[in-house]
Amino acid sequence: MVEPKYKRVILKLSGEALGGEKGFGIDWEVVESIAEEISKVRELGVEVAIVVGGGNFFRGRSAEHIDRATADYMGMLATVINSLALQSILEKRGIPTRVQSAIEMRQIAEPYIRRRAIRHLEKGRVVIFACGTGNPFFSTDTAAALRAAEIDAEAILLAKKVDGVYDSDPKKNPNAKKYDFITYLDVINQRLEVMDSTATSMCMDNQIPIVVFELAKGNIIKAVMGENIGTLVNVKEER
């Protein structure tokens, strides 16, 4: 049997991805599909932690009528809704799941404690990190990079609505070139829409590979196995 390339990963899910085609609210078919893939990944012995966005309910950066900090906190609360939804579907499949929140809300989630999160993973539980970093002005992409560094994740699996990283927007430019591999510095210098520069820099500093791929059936497993899918962001090409 082929061994997975990565044994401990952070799966970064955007809120829009959970919203399905509409990009708003929760598309339960999408969540069920994600849960099914996570179940298969766990069967391979891979430890899975998840960072989920909240853009399917609220985006802090797009709120014009309130100050940015307040808007970001509202966005963090949206990630809790998504985290609880994902936890419920995973547990319905018999997958033990813990939600850890960067902002304390003990009635519905554990507080984020690094050692406890690692222990959950070692015991085969899925851990969902809610509320981003707990600080305004930091994206959930940055939260994914931070948590990946803290729990010693071997890679960040960045599931998006596009099938990789392009040199320009493929929706606007039919001749856009897709990268199979690109360095962190090129992502930052070319201002490519992978992660924000803070998150990308953190991954570069801690040498955490980023696998960017489309959230489609079977792709999470392919990413874990190290198959040539989407785009790999790293210091140097290794696949």
Curated annotation (Swiss-Prot):
Gene3D superfamilies: Acetylglutamate kinase-like. Keywords: Allosteric enzyme, ATP-binding, Cytoplasm, Kinase, Nucleotide-binding, Pyrimidine biosynthesis, Transferase. Its EC number is 2.7.4.22. It catalyses: UMP + ATP = UDP + ADP. ATP binds at K12, L13, S14, G15, G55, R59, Y166, D169. Allosterically activated by GTP. Inhibited by UTP. GO terms for molecular function: ATP binding; UMP kinase activity. GO terms for cellular component: cytoplasm. Its main location: cytoplasm. UMP binds at G54, D72, T133, G134, N135, P136, F137, F138, S139, T140. The keyword 4Fe-4S does not apply. Pfam families: AA_kinase. GO terms for biological process: 'de novo' CTP biosynthetic process; UDP biosynthetic process. It is an enzyme of class 2 (transferase). InterPro entries: AceGlu_kinase-like_sf, Asp/Glu/Uridylate_kinase, Uridylate_kinase, Uridylate_kinase_bac. Pathway: Pyrimidine metabolism; CTP biosynthesis via de novo pathway; UDP from UMP (UMPK route): step 1/1. Homohexamer. Belongs to the UMP kinase family. HAMAP family: PyrH_B. Catalyzes the reversible phosphorylation of UMP to UDP. This is Uridylate kinase.
